[in-house]
């Protein structure tokens, strides 16, 4: 019988849960409005629900009245934003994911030691902007192998590299291999900069790909890790669609006769996954459902001390 294979883990990671709870608890404790620098996570459903509860999402701290509370999103901010918040008398609450903070700390430490840092990631992504702000004169962002080949450093230069936490492990591995080929002495953190949740979700998806011929990645188009999941499937020759609403699950699926895989980005609520699953079952009523467990997750991050 044709079946749906549900990846596990999928959806919310510990950093996203912490960020969302930070906004919710702040609203309960201090009431509305609570200002949030950038979307707390990259998912429209999450942001809309928090906005209804009284969160105000802003990009410019000038929009925040003096002496108000402002939450920094899970993606992190550059030091200049923290400084501006302090100058304006804002009460800052940091919802930056701990794994992003780890990368910030490493960049600061190695920049102080005189290393030039190669930062692998999407240069316009808010996480990369935040990390780069730690040492802008000592950081070079690379997005692909061509940019590695264009780097001006010698093999003897002191170099350190880190990656955006939500990258495709496939792409990151290719870029790192190119870096090490040019700069054999370059090194990184003992553990990967790519976060556990990104690795687990990509691993869970890779695990089911030999069994399916179509994949739905439930996630927002702005979500880096959701887009990387789609690319993981496509790189292995499996058709994949990134959808964020049941209406985007269309009759296109009727063109495919094999099993269907479903996963979700780390900022995707489970109720959106279930709504998309129900729509799929309406289109193909005789589908059975199978859960494929890749690894159990038990990571929990504590809320900011202010809460």
UniProtKB/Swiss-Prot annotation:
Binding site for (2E)-4-hydroxy-3-methylbut-2-enyl diphosphate: 42, 75, 125, 165, 223-225, 267
EC category name: oxidoreductase
Catalytic reactions on record: isopentenyl diphosphate + 2 oxidized [2Fe-2S]-[ferredoxin] + H2O = (2E)-4-hydroxy-3-methylbut-2-enyl diphosphate + 2 reduced [2Fe-2S]-[ferredoxin] + 2 H(+); dimethylallyl diphosphate + 2 oxidized [2Fe-2S]-[ferredoxin] + H2O = (2E)-4-hydroxy-3-methylbut-2-enyl diphosphate + 2 reduced [2Fe-2S]-[ferredoxin] + 2 H(+)
Positions annotated to bind [4Fe-4S] cluster: 13, 97, 195
Positions of dimethylallyl diphosphate binding: 42, 75, 125, 223-225, 267
Active site residues of this protein: 127
Record-level Gene Ontology MF annotations: 4 iron, 4 sulfur cluster binding; 4-hydroxy-3-methylbut-2-enyl diphosphate reductase activity; metal ion binding
Presence of the UniProt keyword ATP-binding in the record: no
Residues that hold isopentenyl diphosphate according to the record: 42, 75, 125, 223-225, 267
Pfam families found in the cross-reference section: LYTB (PF02401)
UniProt keyword list: 4Fe-4S, Iron, Iron-sulfur, Isoprene biosynthesis, Metal-binding, Oxidoreductase
Function (record text): Catalyzes the conversion of 1-hydroxy-2-methyl-2-(E)-butenyl 4-diphosphate (HMBPP) into a mixture of isopentenyl diphosphate (IPP) and dimethylallyl diphosphate (DMAPP). Acts in the terminal step of the DOXP/MEP pathway for isoprenoid precursor biosynthesis.
PANTHER family: 4-HYDROXY-3-METHYLBUT-2-ENYL DIPHOSPHATE REDUCTASE (PTHR30426:SF0)
Family per record: Belongs to the IspH family.
Record protein name field: 4-hydroxy-3-methylbut-2-enyl diphosphate reductase
Species whose genome carries this gene: Chlamydia trachomatis serovar A (strain ATCC VR-571B / DSM 19440 / HAR-13)
């Amino acid at each position: 019988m044709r079946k749906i294979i549900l990846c596990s883990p999928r959806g919310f990671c510990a950093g996203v849960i912490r960020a969302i709870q930070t906004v919710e608890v702040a609203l309960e404790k201090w009431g509305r409005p609570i200002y949030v620098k950038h979307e707390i996570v990259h998912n429209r459903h999450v942001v809309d629900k928090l906005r209804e509860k009284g969160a105000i999402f802003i990009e410019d701290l000038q929009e925040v009245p003096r002496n108000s509370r402002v939450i920094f999103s899970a993606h992190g901010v550059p030091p200049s934003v923290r400084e501006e918040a302090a100058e304006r008398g804002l009460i800052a609450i940091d919802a930056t994911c701990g794994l992003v903070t780890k990368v910030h700390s490493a960049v600061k430490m190695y920049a102080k030691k005189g290393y030039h840092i190669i930062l692998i990631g999407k240069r316009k992504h808010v996480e990369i902007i935040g990390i780069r702000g730690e040492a802008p004169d000592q950081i070079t962002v690379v997005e692909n192998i061509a940019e590695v080949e264009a780097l001006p450093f010698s093999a003897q230069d002191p170099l350190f590299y880190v990656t955006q936490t939500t990258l495709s492990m496939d792409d990151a591995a290719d870029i790192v291999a190119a870096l090490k080929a040019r700069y054999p002495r370059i090194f990184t953190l003992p553990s990967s900069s790519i976060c556990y949740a990104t690795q687990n979700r990509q691993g869970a998806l890779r695990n089911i790909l030999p069994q399916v011929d179509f994949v739905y990645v439930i996630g927002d188009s702005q979500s880096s890790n959701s887009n990387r999941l789609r690319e993981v499937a496509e790189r292995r020759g499996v058709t994949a669609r990134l959808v964020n609403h049941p209406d985007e699950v269309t009759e296109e699926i009727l063109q495919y006769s094999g099993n269907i895989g479903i996963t979700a980005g780390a900022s995707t609520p489970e109720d959106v996954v279930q709504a998309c699953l129900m729509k799929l079952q309406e289109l193909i009523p005789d589908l059975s459902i199978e859960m494929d467990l890749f690894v159990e997750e038990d990571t929990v991050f504590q809320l900011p001390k202010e809460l």
